[in-house]
């Protein structure tokens, strides 16, 4: 069975909430292409784009993330529950920003 993006979003939200990580749906009127979620925990702010397995970010999303990273933002693309769990481990257990290379390219 293929997981839908909404299933991944539900899993993501549940896991982050259980860990005490603030998670907000990120919408920016007039600016398409921003990541889906903002995470805030222990003085760290991250942006996460959630995709169904096998789906790739749109070119506008890739360009927006490139501009954000150029200014020091931490942005990740996640498409599996394993990646959600890895992100949670890095934030809650390792107390470190995850390596962007451990996630899907964006």
Predicted regions: what they are:
Residues 1-106:
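Catalytic phosphate/metal-binding cores of nucleic-acid and nucleotide-processing enzymes, i.e., regions
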